[in-house]
């Protein structure tokens, strides 16, 4: 029995006998707004959330634009550090998702937490503060910094990678040890994959899956700039992110968070939950080719796409739309096109990039784009790829240029391709 027929008959198991996994809650924080509906409305309207950076001085930087999220508690105060922003945005998204799912009692989520987040470290303002606390000319040297940090437990806790997940787990009362993961730009999708597989294995009936990113800060911006990965179209921020377009020249850094409440379909039905969509399958492949570049043969990208479709029990022709990784770098868009043509042949479905409007949210991207994929299915409307002014003849794809479009969408492939060849693809489907 095919998976689609299995779902149509009301079954709760997929083509491999695993529990079908439903999404019953979603939450979003993006440069377009805080909350699912505000972000989604902005995306369908083709509105850009990219603007000039106001959080720190940019006079001597090559790139001075980003997708910033303005948090309410920052008004009139200094910005939170990156770990603080990650935790706060993850909490906002999780609160929205859990409330929408109506699951568990307050502070007691009935499943594990899977958190995708960036590596964290002490940032420049904190280092300068420690240096000032050192002794004379030796203050900037490592032993003096260690001495100045003695007793500063907030620095240690803020830069402790696992600490963010532990605090979120305490806040929402998730079960078991929280899992934090970072797989470069595939991180958010990896968190969803972990939740999907935990439910499929019967280890949990529900999971809280989060992807969060808060790295719009000087050091991260400079590091990506040194890789020549960022757009320098500073004079017109809204038009800087140009996935699949001929004049593209780099991605735009951004931040945000997304949360998904996953449940076995059987559990969701038993408690009368509203099912927003299904996570039908996941595929991952790594190529270990280079620290930042993908193998030019596209093998891992193609393999991840094919693996996700096969895991869902589908054929490529059953995918109605692809939510692109679509960063706007010359190499990534070329590689994704290669993957599309290899997997779908001449009959490629429409593909569009949310990053044209919200920028590249890095560790959060896979989770944010999974939520947008579910909303695409819900509303039967494809979000556009904006800033598509000059088509690239090397990219013969329908990229839904500039304007959203009504379409029949039952299944979406959502692509996440990360530095170091870490690739994760998800297949999302309509509720039964």
Give the ranges of each region predicted by the language model.
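Flexible, low-complexity linker/loop segments at domain and module junctions
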Residues: 1-23, 106-110, 312-318, 396-432
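Conserved beta-ketoacyl condensing-enzyme motif
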Residues: 23, 44-179, 212-221, 316-332
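Short pre-catalytic strand/loop immediately N-terminal to key active-site residues, enriched for Gly-Thr
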Residues: 155-156, 176-183, 245-249, 351-360, ...
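Acyl-CoA/ACP chain-elongation machinery
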Residues: 203-249, 282-296, 324-333, 348-398
């Amino acid at each position: 029995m095919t998976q689609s027929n299995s779902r149509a008959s009301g079954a709760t198991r997929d083509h491999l006998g695993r529990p079908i996994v439903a999404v019953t809650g979603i939450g979003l924080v993006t440069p377009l707004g805080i909350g699912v509906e505000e972000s989604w409305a902005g995306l369908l309207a083709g509105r850009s959330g990219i603007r000039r950076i106001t959080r720190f001085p940019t006079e001597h930087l090559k790139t001075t634009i980003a997708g910033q999220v303005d948090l309410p508690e920052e008004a009139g105060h200094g910005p939170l550090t990156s770990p603080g922003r990650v935790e706060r945005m993850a909490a906002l998204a999780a609160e929205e998702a859990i409330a929408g799912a109506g699951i568990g009692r307050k502070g007691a989520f009935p499943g594990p937490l899977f958190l995708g987040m960036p590596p964290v470290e002490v940032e420049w303002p904190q280092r300068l503060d420690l240096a000032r606390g050192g002794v004379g000319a030796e203050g900037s040297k490592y032993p003096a910094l260690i001495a100045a940090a003695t007793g500063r437990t907030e620095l240690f806790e803020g830069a402790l990678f696992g600490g963010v997940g532990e605090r979120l787990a305490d806040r929402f009362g998730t079960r078991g040890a929280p899992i934090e993961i970072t797989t470069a730009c595939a991180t958010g999708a990896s968190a969803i994959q972990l939740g999907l597989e935990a439910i499929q294995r019967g280890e949990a009936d529900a999971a809280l899956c989060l992807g969060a990113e808060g790295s719009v800060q000087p050091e991260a911006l400079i590091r990506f700039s040194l890789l020549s990965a960022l757009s320098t179209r500073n004079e017109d921020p809204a038009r800087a992110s140009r996935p699949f377009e001929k004049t593209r020249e780099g991605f735009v850094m951004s931040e945000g968070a997304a949360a998904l409440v996953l449940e076995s379909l059987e559990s969701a039905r038993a408690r009368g939950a509203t099912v927003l969509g299904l996570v039908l399958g996941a595929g991952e492949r790594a190529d270990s080719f280079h620290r930042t570049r993908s193998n030019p043969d596209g093998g891992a990208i193609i393999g991840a796409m094919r693996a996700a479709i096969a895991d869902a029990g589908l054929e490529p022709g059953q995918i109605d739309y692809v939510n692109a990784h679509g960063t706007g770098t010359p190499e990534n868009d070329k590689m994704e096109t290669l993957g599309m043509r290899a997997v779908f042949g001449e009959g490629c479905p429409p593909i569009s990039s949310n990053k044209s409007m919200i920028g590249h949210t890095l560790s959060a991207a896979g989770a944010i784009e999974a939520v947008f994929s579910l909303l695409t299915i819900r509303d039967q409307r494809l979000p556009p790829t904006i800033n598509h002014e000059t088509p690239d003849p090397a990219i013969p794809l329908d990229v839904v240029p500039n304007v959203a479009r009504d379409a029949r969408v039952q299944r979406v492939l959502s692509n996440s391709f990360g530095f170091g060849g870490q690739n994760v693809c998800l297949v999302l489907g309509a509720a039964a």
